[in-house]
């Protein structure tokens, strides 16, 4: 029993609030109030809700979530909060984002090679360029963003 190493089980805390500014403020207050690790600050689907995910020992996570929930409640932005004291084996691994690999941008010579490989038939010719987004007529002198009255087809709409 002396050979077994004693590990402190990490707990998971979730705080859902309304709005990015409130989420950042809550994460700041929670990090200052207890010894926790901020896992993620995620946008949820709809309503502008944000989820703050933290880990740490059980007491620290409970204290941080309580502090963050109280602060969010003062600003009328608390949606939900939850502390999972001993999450399952795969939960924390699934929650931890993997480091993203940033690919280097292609150099100008590589871009030129790709452009030269494209068939010339697909590129629109100078005379086929459409400047009017209303009538899509290449002969129309109107440019996108100019008044509709400049379109050569402006008086012909809705006629059968």
Swiss-Prot record:
<dbReference type="InterPro" id="IPR044872">
    <property type="entry name" value="CcmK/CsoS1_BMC"/>
</dbReference>
<dbReference type="GO" id="GO:0031472">
    <property type="term" value="C:propanediol degradation polyhedral organelle"/>
</dbReference>
<keyword id="KW-1283">Bacterial microcompartment</keyword>
<dbReference type="InterPro" id="IPR050575">
    <property type="entry name" value="BMC_shell"/>
</dbReference>
<feature type="domain" description="BMC">
    <location>
        <begin position="11"/>
        <end position="96"/>
    </location>
</feature>
<comment type="function">
    <text>The 1,2-PD-specific bacterial microcompartment (BMC) concentrates low levels of 1,2-PD catabolic enzymes, concentrates volatile reaction intermediates thus enhancing pathway flux and keeps the level of toxic, mutagenic propionaldehyde low.</text>
</comment>
<protein>
    <recommendedName>
        <fullName>Bacterial microcompartment shell protein PduK</fullName>
    </recommendedName>
</protein>
<keyword id="KW-0408">Iron</keyword>
<dbReference type="InterPro" id="IPR037233">
    <property type="entry name" value="CcmK-like_sf"/>
</dbReference>
<dbReference type="GO" id="GO:0051144">
    <property type="term" value="P:propanediol catabolic process"/>
</dbReference>
<comment type="subunit">
    <text>Interacts with shell proteins PduA and PduP and assembly protein PduM.</text>
</comment>
<dbReference type="InterPro" id="IPR000249">
    <property type="entry name" value="BMC_dom"/>
</dbReference>
<dbReference type="Pfam" id="PF00936">
    <property type="entry name" value="BMC"/>
</dbReference>
<comment type="function">
    <text>A minor shell protein of the bacterial microcompartment (BMC) dedicated to 1,2-propanediol (1,2-PD) degradation. The isolated BMC shell component protein ratio for J:A:B':B:K:T:U is approximately 15:10:7:6:1:1:2. Not required for structural integrity of BMCs nor to mitigate propionaldehyde toxicity, it might be involved in spatial organization of BMCs.</text>
</comment>
<comment type="pathway">
    <text>Polyol metabolism; 1,2-propanediol degradation.</text>
</comment>
<comment type="similarity">
    <text>Belongs to the bacterial microcompartments protein family.</text>
</comment>
């Amino acid at each position: 029993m002396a050979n077994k190493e004693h590990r402190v089980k990490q707990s998971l805390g979730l705080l859902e609030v309304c709005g990015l500014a409130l989420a950042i403020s809550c994460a700041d207050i929670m990090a200052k109030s207890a010894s926790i690790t901020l896992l993620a600050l995620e946008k949820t689907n709809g309503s502008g809700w944000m989820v703050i995910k933290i880990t740490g020992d059980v007491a620290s996570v409970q204290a941080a979530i309580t502090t963050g929930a109280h602060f969010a409640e003062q600003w009328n932005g608390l949606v939900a909060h939850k502390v999972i004291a001993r999450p399952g084996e795969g939960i924390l691994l699934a929650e931890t984002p993997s480091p993203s690999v940033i690919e280097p941008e292609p150099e100008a010579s590589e871009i030129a090679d790709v452009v030269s490989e494209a068939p010339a038939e697909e590129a629109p010719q100078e005379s086929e360029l459409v400047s009017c987004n209303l009538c899509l007529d290449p002969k129309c002198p109107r440019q996108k963003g100019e008044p509709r009255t400049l379109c050569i087809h402006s008086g012909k709409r809705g006629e059968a």
